[in-house]
A protein has these predicted regions:
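Acidic, glycine-enriched active-site microenvironments
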Residues: 163, 170-172, 200-206
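C-terminal edge-of-domain segments
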Residues: 126-138, 142-155
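A phosphate-binding glycine/aspartate-rich beta-alpha loop in the early core of alpha/beta enzymes
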Residues: 66, 70-86
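Conserved small/polar residues in nucleotide/adenosyl-binding loops
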Residues: 209-211
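Short HxH-centered metal-ligating active-site micro-motif
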Residues: 40-54, 79, 83, 96-101
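Mature, structured domains of secreted/extracytosolic soluble proteins
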Residues: 1-42, 48-57, 62, 66-69, ...
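Mid-chain, well-packed structural core segment of small domains
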Residues: 80-125
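Intrinsic-disorder/low-complexity signal
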Residues: 147-148, 155, 159-160, 180-187
Length: 211
């Protein structure tokens, strides 16, 4: 019988605002090869300005061009270029306390989206496999930000269930929907779905379908 999945946590502190870390070797160093017996690993991070490059993108770029790819994003979205995100006094989604601490990092959010960074990726757990964790806002106001990433080593993955959720959209061809809005109730539906699945370790994969 295969052992249960193993979850490990790694805390990172960047030295530069834009920084790339190869995570597989970092986890091996920090946790003394605890993951060695697991054939696959799932890496995830809850940050919105730091995430992972997809495995297929790393393969297309090649290890030698990952840094150039990140630098290109930095040039496309320069810091402090008047992004609406950074005009904190106009943002109705923030209260006074949040405005006092909210970083002006609109460029990092745009680079995350345009660069195809992911909050969660899976990789074979083998020598030579490259896992790229990219921090796009590692230093803010001269202070390094602390990032927490997790890895789950596992032997196999199976689909526990599927559910279809309805998201109302406007008639305009371009729309933005906050999936966390309580009025939609999506998170509550997902929580009930997870509870019914009764899975100890798993992930939710959300995708859009055209109706």
């Amino acid at each position: 019988m295969a052992p249960p999945p193993l979850e490990l946590v790694l805390e990172l502190s960047a030295r530069e605002r834009f920084e790339m870390v190869e995570l597989r070797s970092r986890f091996s160093t920090e946790h003394d090869e605890s993951l060695a017996s697991y054939p696959r690993c799932l890496y995830w991070s809850a940050h919105t300005t730091a995430g992972f490059l997809d495995r297929s993108l790393i393969a297309r770029l090649g290890p030698g061009r990952v840094a150039s790819y990140i630098e290109t994003l930095r040039h496309i979205f320069p810091e402090g270029a008047g992004y609406a995100h950074d005009r904190l006094e106009r943002r109705k989604d923030l209260d006074a306390a949040q405005r006092a601490v909210e970083p002006r990092n609109g460029d990092s959010h745009l680079a995350f989206i345009a660069g195809g960074l992911q909050p969660c990726v899976t990789h074979p757990n083998r020598a030579g496999e490259i896992v790229c964790f990219v921090d796009l806002d590692g230093v803010n106001d001269g202070r390094p930000r602390r990032r927490q990433t997790r890895v789950i080593g596992y032997h196999r993955e199976a689909v526990a269930g599927q559910i279809r959720l309805k998201v109302p959209v406007a008639g305009h061809p371009i729309d933005s929907i906050n999936l966390k809005a309580r009025s939609l109730g999506l998170y509550e539906e997902l929580a009930e779905f997870v509870a019914r699945a009764d899975v100890g370790k798993g992930r939710l994969h959300l995708s859009l379908i055209h109706i």
